[in-house]
Amino acid sequence: MKNFFLKLGVCALALTGAAEALAQEQVIQLFAHRGSRFEYDENTLPAFKASYDAGLRGFETDIRMTRDGELVISHDETLARLTPCKRVVETMTAYEIRKVKTNQGNDLIFLPELVDFFADKDNVYIEFEMKTKPVESYPEERLREYCEKVYNTVMAKKPANSLYLFPSSDKRALKMMRLLHPDVDLLLIISKPICEETILEAIDMGIKRLGCRIEG
């Protein structure tokens, strides 16, 4: 837990509806990072189903784009850690990725599938992290395409009283998303402790939420 991020507080302060009352009382809201990642393969549908069934209402996931422009749920640049496949996500087509199984035999999922799962679930907080590194995999036009597709896919089925955020450590992605959708909820991920510098950096980008280290 040494690299524990200040996202629990962000989650509590940002929730809407019934959870907003909890936030006003400064109650910390627990959430599932990549789903139930220790009990199930991370970022798979069983992982998210299990954590939701366990009563969690806050979640985080990661989005990358395949070579042919499909949005797949994957934290790592390659599939090597979770599957027998060693390839880079951005070099694969959606068809190729759909043929890959995790080491536990689960399917890799695409963003529309995850959005569909949460479409009928009220008062949920989700961080859809934009994974757009390495930078060379997402030049400006591809980055624009990515941001537009992510936003449209996620927001198309968002329940009215849920809160969906778009975090990233890539400032290019945050700026592009802000340019395309000025009212979007963003979160800046920084590997440094919270300090005046990080706060001012977020304010300068028009971002109200930080994901940063507590220690330091």
Please state what every model-predicted region is.
Residues 1-8:
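Bacterial N-terminal signal peptides that target proteins for export
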Residues 9, 22-216:
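Phosphate-group recognition and catalysis centered on beta-loop-alpha active-site segments
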